[in-house]
């Protein structure tokens, strides 16, 4: 794992700062843009090997839009994933960045936006994902690696809560390894599994 890298802020050098355009309704019921910005809750991760930007979060599913309940919730930094909610997180990976094997107890839908990344599963199976490719991670132990030693990569993850995951009669555990320290200051989103 690369524990240091060239990333000192989001976005990573060489990648554009994405805009988000949040819609809603005005007092007359017309569809309008209610917020245009670059996202909330940015953080450098793993000593500069990656950086994240929380694009959206909501504390319920179905999502409560009336009265902008979701936008009020999103003002607070979310947990890794949100029980009964949704979190959309963009992560930039430094050149050569490689995570440890990890499992979050959520459905992780990951879309490659920039660059090329390798997804390795706990079984050792691997796939290369390119811009536009999507991984649907259903609680699998996995690892990400930016295949380039020269350019950053970017992924967009939508994280949804799941019911307890039982495989071969055994309930699978949350296991983020050393990545958990990146989320330790977050709230109680992952239950009793905290950084050691």
Curated annotation (Swiss-Prot):
Q: Does the keyword Oxidoreductase apply?
A: yes
Name the Enzyme Commission number(s) assigned to this protein: 1.-.-.-
Task: Recall the GO molecular function terms of this protein's record.
Answer: oxidoreductase activity
* Record Gene3D superfamilies: Jelly Rolls
Tell me, using the record's free text, what induces this protein: Expression is up-regulated during sexual development. Expression is also up-regulated during confrontation with the arthropod fungivore Drosophila melanogaster.
What residues does the Cupin type-2 domain cover? 92-156
Q: Which domain of life is it from?
A: Eukaryota
State the UniProt keywords alphabetically: Oxidoreductase
Q: What class of enzyme is it?
A: oxidoreductase
Q: Which SUPFAM superfamilies does UniProt cross-reference here?
A: RmlC-like cupins
User: What's the family?
Assistant: Belongs to the virC family.
Summary of the function given for this chain in its UniProt record? Cupin-domain-containing oxidoreductase; part of the gene cluster that mediates the biosynthesis of sordarial, a salicylic aldehyde structurally related to the phytotoxin pyriculol. The most interesting aspect of this pathway is formation of an aromatic product from the highly reducing polyketide synthase srdA. SrdA synthesizes a reduced polyketide chain from one molecule of acetyl-CoA and five molecules of malonyl-CoA. The polyketide chain is then reductively released as an aldehyde.
Output this protein's name: Cupin-domain-containing oxidoreductase srdB
- Organism equals Neurospora crassa (strain ATCC 24698 / 74-OR23-1A / CBS 708.71 / DSM 1257 / FGSC 987)
- What is the name of the gene encoding this protein? srdB
